[in-house]
């Protein structure tokens, strides 16, 4: 989760907490609580299991994925479908 996503989650949580404190949150009537990804409207797509998780040559990632360098781990990783994919 990147910093922007974390800030959005914290903002959402603080807004919900503030509304609960004021008693302004409407009661749910038979609806399930939506997942955080639905609340943040993340796009999902079908990802093949053959997508690599790492990209040492910076060109191994599946279409639509981004090869990103981690300073902490000194490695290139595929971000997107390949994250944790079929390495």
Curated annotation (Swiss-Prot):
Keywords linked to the UniProt accession: Calcium channel impairing toxin, Disulfide bond, Ion channel impairing toxin, Secreted, Signal, Toxin, Voltage-gated calcium channel impairing toxin
Signal peptide (residue range): 1-18
Post-translational modification: Contains 4 disulfide bonds.
Molecular function GO labels: calcium channel regulator activity; toxin activity
Propeptide: 19-34
Tissue: Expressed by the venom duct.
Keyword Magnesium: no
Location of the protein in the cell: Secreted
Keyword Cell membrane: no
Main location class: secreted
GO CC list: extracellular region
Transmembrane segments: none
Domain notes: The cysteine framework is XIII (C-C-C-CC-C-C-C).
Known function: May interact and inhibit Cav3.1/CACNA1G calcium channels. In a ex vivo model, shows ability to block nerve signal transduction.
Protein name: Conotoxin QcMNCL-XIII0.1
Naturally occurring in which organism (per UniProt): Conus quercinus
């Amino acid at each position: 989760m990147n910093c922007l996503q974390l800030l959005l989650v914290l903002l959402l949580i603080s807004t919900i907490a503030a509304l609960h404190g004021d008693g302004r949150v409407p009661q749910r009537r038979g609806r399930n609580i939506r997942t955080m990804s639905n609340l943040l409207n993340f796009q999902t797509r079908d990802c093949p299991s053959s997508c690599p998780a790492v990209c040492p040559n910076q060109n191994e990632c599946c279409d639509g994925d981004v090869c990103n360098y981690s300073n902490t781990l000194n490695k290139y990783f595929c971000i997107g479908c390949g994250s944790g994919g079929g390495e």
